[in-house]
Each structure stands twice: as structure tokens, then as C-alpha cells.
Design a protein with these regions (language model features):
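A short Gly-Trp-Pro
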Residues: 3-135
Length: 135
């Protein structure tokens, strides 16, 4: 897996779409109900669009009503790093890829059991590696 730091800014701008760059590198937020995965029900693994790290399983995805893909748990304890975000006059928990530092979205304490957490992610920060049907 490649880390963000191994890419120059010019390389990141070339390999990411403008929206992916704005979200992952500038802590942007896509508009609600517009991202590719907000209403996606396909099975698979959601990976970081920058470094391809596995972040979330579709098994932990749920409909939060927020308009963004929401998950109650990451695939492992060390794949998503949580940081304090004080932008826009709020105190929130920013979720970033622990491997490459890409901004993914935010974590809120209003999710379902068993964790009570809602990882509210930007579709632009992820790609879905769909499960393949077994023959």
C-alpha cells in the first residue's frame, strides 16, 4: 500500500478526481445524498481511495438517514484514526485513514448497537471492492 506522503501534491491531483482531492486532502465534505455509496447496498469492503487500505465492511453499513454512507465499526481497531476537529465552530471527531492520513469523514456517538458509533463517511474518500459471487 502506498502512503499519501509517497505522492507529491501534483501526483495526488492527477490520480484523484477534484472531489476526491478536496475531500481527502483538504478535509472537504461532499453534499448529503449525492455520493456514490450513500444508498449502496452491495456487499464488499470499502477501501481508502488514496492508499487502498481496507476501512469498512458492508456488514457494518447501515441507513442512518444522514445522506452519507454510515458504518458502526471499522474493519479493525487501527485502520481509522480519530482526531479532534474544531472547524466550523464545532467540536467533532474527525476520521482519517491511519495509513495515509486521508480525511474520510467524522465519527459520532449516535450509532446503533453494538458500538453506539456512527462513522459518517464521504463516498469520495472510498472505493467499494465488491464481493464476487461464488460459483
Amino acid at each position: 500500500m502506498a502512503e499519501t506522503s509517497s505522492y507529491t501534491d501534483a501526483e495526488l491531483r492527477e490520480r484523484l478526481t477534484p472531489e476526491q482531492y478536496a475531500v481527502t486532502q483538504q478535509a472537504g465534505t461532499e453534499r448529503a445524498f449525492t455520493g456514490e455509496y450513500w444508498d449502496c447496498h452491495d456487499d464488499g469492503t470499502y477501501r481508502c481511495v488514496v492508499c487502498d487500505t481496507a476501512l469498512f465492511s458492508s456488514d457494518t453499513k447501515y441507513e442512518s438517514g444522514s445522506g452519507w454512507p454510515s458504518f458502526f465499526e471499522a474493519v479493525g481497531p487501527d485502520v481509522v484514526e480519530i482526531r479532534t476537529d474544531t472547524s466550523h465552530g464545532m467540536i467533532r471527531e474527525e476520521a482519517v485513514c491511519a495509513n495515509c492520513d486521508a480525511h474520510l469523514g467524522h465519527r459520532f456517538p449516535d450509532g446503533p448497537a453494538p458500538t453506539g458509533e456512527r462513522y459518517c463517511m464521504n463516498s469520495a474518500a472510498m472505493r467499494l471492492e465488491r464481493d464476487t459471487a461464488e460459483d
